[in-house]
């Protein structure tokens, strides 16, 4: 059986495609760089982090964008006629006054690892844009056209516009073609496909919260009209009817289903195997209950599907409830490399599993300056939306132990470095070494930001020598705490126990759609040049344990 989620941690809005025997899956990254991870599989069960699409933080400038803005809902497709991969993605610039100012772009590559073409601007009519490669060679871009006018149904409807690959521009204005297949409202995430005589439109409805779902419609004409699937929704965490068209809230916690491990299931994309089997990937979450807080963010899950005799897509078991265990395909099992638990930084390149907010990690993290270490150059404070030195990886379990060994000699109080548990620039816990002017020497202490409110735990600070120091973060379900050591054997706890559940979309006021990260960090708020050397980064997580 395939165990869900297939890609745990902050990996939302999955879009899947196949080229030959290889399956590729793209997810959203929002303010994090590198952007748009591509996961690879041979059997739909085992997945590896393969590459990233966006690696130039000058070409795609995310600096100064608030949390949860940036790269939204990439659409990854493979056009067999052209032997070409397409990625359509949006850069969300602002959600102020619910205007959702977004710019949508298209890029292509012959190889999934690139190089990718220069971005082609499509439009700014709405978000979650995707592309259809029609049988006749024409192409169409669909997206949610966000509604801002008073007196009109929110949040809007699915619109479509033709795209000219020759001219590299869309033709005319987008036209509305679909307003949903259920009464759940909050339609988004359209994917348009062609199978046989039908065009199928797959969407998410209900908001990307507890009433989330996958719906479908179909038409024999690309411009419609589209008929609703009589079973809608076809995949969800909360089966049953609901009418929420007038409710703009995306979270809708009243629809939490205590009978399901997987919550928020929706935003789907399907693929057919070489043997004709059908699988659908979708986002999902596993909240702490009863708090209903999803510390791991929105994750990627998969469901086995089938086509009915009357050409509708259904879950293989005939239900529409997302399952945590899914039948495997007939493809031969193919284990793939996993991200290593221990990184001793002996490689000449930084691992592709590291991310940084708004800038590329390589702009401040150097594995060549001192072989066997990563040197992190300090920049702005960790609350900044500009240039912040946080070298992070995704938290994939709420049962984890993260350890590092650091060499750092702060010279002024604006210098600090250490280990961090991070949701966004307004929510983090940082065990830091810094220069204490009061003590006249280096010290370690914890600094905590909770929805923008800063607390420095000076009562538990400890003076330390300027020698190598070990730092460790424990995450045990709802409880998280830090420890430190001189020798890496005898650790002592520092500070209090923190509430892991608060690192979540539901609790954090300044972000909505990402997930929790753990990592190494350094700040130099004077000259942006003082650095810390880290000998290793060890991440041990038990991904088999349930969230609760």
Can you name each region flagged by the protein language model?
Residues 1-548:
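Carbohydrate-active catalytic/glycan-binding domains of CAZyme proteins
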């Amino acid at each position: 059986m395939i165990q869900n989620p297939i890609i745990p941690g902050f990996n939302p809005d999955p879009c899947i495609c196949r080229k030959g025997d290889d399956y590729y899956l793209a997810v959203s990254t929002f303010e994090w760089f590198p952007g748009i991870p591509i996961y690879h599989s041979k059997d739909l069960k085992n997945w590896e982090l393969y590459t990233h699409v966006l690696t130039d933080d000058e070409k795609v400038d995310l600096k100064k964008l608030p949390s949860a803005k940036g790269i939204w809902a990439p659409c990854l497709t493979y056009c067999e006629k052209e032997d070409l991969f397409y990625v359509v993605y949006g850069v969300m610039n602002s959600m102020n006054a619910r205007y959702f100012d977004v710019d949508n772009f298209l890029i292509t590559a012959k190889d999934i690892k690139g190089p990718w073409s220069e971005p082609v601007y499509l439009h700014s009519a709405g978000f979650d844009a995707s592309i259809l490669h029609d049988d006749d060679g024409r192409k169409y871009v669909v997206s949610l056209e966000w509604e801002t006018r008073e007196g009109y149904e929110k949040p809007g409807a699915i619109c479509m516009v033709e795209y000219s690959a020759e001219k590299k521009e869309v033709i005319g204005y987008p036209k509305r073609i679909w307003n949903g297949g259920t009464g759940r409202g909050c339609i988004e995430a359209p994917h348009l496909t062609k199978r046989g005589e039908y065009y199928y439109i797959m969407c998410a409805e209900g908001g990307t919260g507890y009433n989330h779902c996958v719906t479908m419609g179909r038409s024999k004409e690309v411009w419609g009209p589209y008929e609703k699937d009589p079973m809608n929704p076809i995949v969800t965490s909360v089966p049953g009817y609901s009418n929420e068209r007038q409710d703009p809230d995306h979270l809708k916690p009243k629809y939490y289903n205590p009978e399901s491990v997987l919550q928020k299931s929706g935003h789907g994309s399907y693929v057919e195997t070489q043997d004709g089997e059908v699988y659908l990937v979708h986002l999902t979450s596993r909240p702490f209950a009863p708090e209903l807080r999803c510390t791991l963010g929105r994750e990627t899950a998969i469901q086995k599907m089938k086509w009915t005799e009357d050409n509708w897509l259904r879950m293989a078991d005939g239900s529409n409830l997302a399952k945590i265990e899914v039948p495997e395909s007939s493809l031969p099992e193919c284990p793939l490399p996993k991200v290593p638990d221990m990184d001793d930084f002996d490689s000449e390149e930084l691992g592709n599993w590291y991310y940084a907010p708004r800038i590329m990690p390589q702009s401040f993290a150097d594995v060549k300056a001192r072989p066997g270490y990563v040197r992190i150059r300090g920049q702005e404070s960790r609350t900044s939306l500009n240039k912040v030195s946080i070298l992070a990886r995704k938290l994939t379990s709420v049962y984890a132990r993260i350890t590092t060994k650091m060499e750092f000699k702060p010279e002024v109080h604006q210098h600090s470095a250490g280990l961090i548990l991070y949701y966004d620039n307004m929510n983090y816990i940082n065990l830091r070494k810094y220069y204490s002017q009061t003590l006249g020497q280096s010290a370690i202490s914890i600094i905590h930001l909770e929805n923008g409110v800063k607390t420095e735990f000076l009562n538990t600070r400890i003076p330390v020598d300027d020698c190598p120091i070990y730092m460790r973060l424990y995450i045990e379900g709802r409880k998280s705490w830090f420890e430190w050591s001189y020798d890496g054997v005898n650790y002592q706890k520092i500070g209090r126990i923190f509430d892991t559940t608060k690192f979540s979309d539901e609790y954090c006021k300044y972000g909505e759609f990402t997930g929790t990260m753990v990592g190494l960090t350094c700040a130099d708020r004077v000259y942006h040049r003082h650095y810390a050397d880290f000998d290793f980064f060890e991440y041990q997580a038990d991904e088999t344990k349930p969230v609760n």
